[in-house]
Amino acid sequence: MFRLVSYRSDRTAPSWRAGVASHHALIDLAGYADGTYRSVRSFLAASPDEQEQILAWTTRQLDGGEQVLSLDEVELGPPVPDPEKIVCLGLNYPEHAAEAELDIPPVPTFFAKFRNSLVGPTSPVILPAASHFIDYEGELVVVIGKRCKHVAEQEALAYVAGYTVCNDVSARDLQMQTSQWTAGKAIDTFAPMGPGIVLASDIPDPQVLTLTTRVNGEVVQRESTSQMIFSVAATIAFLSSFMTLEPGDLIATGTPSGIGARRQPPQFLHPGDIVEVEIERIGMIRNQMVAEARPQTR
């Protein structure tokens, strides 16, 4: 099984490189076609035939090429560090809507995050001094593979490149200050994602996956994606009815029940806490919470 990843060997490098990982081995895509594919987005924008050729080349490299790296020697970043859009669903599991004491929405409820929120699967999450009510939300993320607009639900999965894992970290006090949730969602480092993109060909049905979230080793969320109110296909059909989806766009499909704000007593995140989100057949992200450094005062 291949995973598309963004990585860097040097933590001081200004940008992420694109690679294909298999088990613990990694092939840098810059070695193919004179460096044409230096980003995951450029791979996703390639034609299906070209993608097949790239993956065939990757297989040959893994079988004895000179460009094999070890995943243990690199830092993984967000799989798509430069998406055009990050669309996030809210209230997409019935038990989560119930714990939030909200009605099931008639159409998908969504909001946006931005690139500043993206970090890798093991990067620290910075807890802002402006909030004391930080929460976790484990989610399945859909990565769009082909431009689409006005897509029928029965055809929607054909436009998916693959799937990855996200923690939609949320500052509940900032989120609920207004009817728009952006202030509590689009915070720096609040979308750790990874470890890579598992291709859609390896996950023909995204509605049969088990999602598990752990805080300091304790399971706090466990649910099947079969329980989504709006399936991946239905969500793509809805969004594409009024916006063009592009290769590399990310759709976070909502979190199940078990969020910290609705536990008794509430369980918010603190510096030192470690949150793991794992989805079967895709992988796990593991991020430590770190307090924001306060600015120096004169």
Label each residue range with its predicted role.
Residues 103-121, 136, 270-281:
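Structural signature of FAD isoalloxazine-binding scaffolds in flavoprotein oxidoreductases
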Residues 109-128, 148-149, 189-198, 256-260:
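Short catalytic-site patches enriched in acidic/histidine residues
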Residues 5, 76-78, 98-101, 125-134, ...:
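A generic local secondary-structure boundary/capping motif
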Residues 1-108, 276:
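N-terminal non-catalytic cap/leader segment that marks the start of a structured domain
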Residues 10, 24-25, 145-149, 169-170, ...:
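Short loop segments at secondary-structure junctions
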Residues 120-156, 161, 166-170:
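Non-heme Fe(II) oxygenase catalytic core, chiefly the N-lobe of the double-stranded beta-helix
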Residues 15, 52-55, 69, 75, ...:
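Catalytic-pocket segment enriched in acidic/His residues
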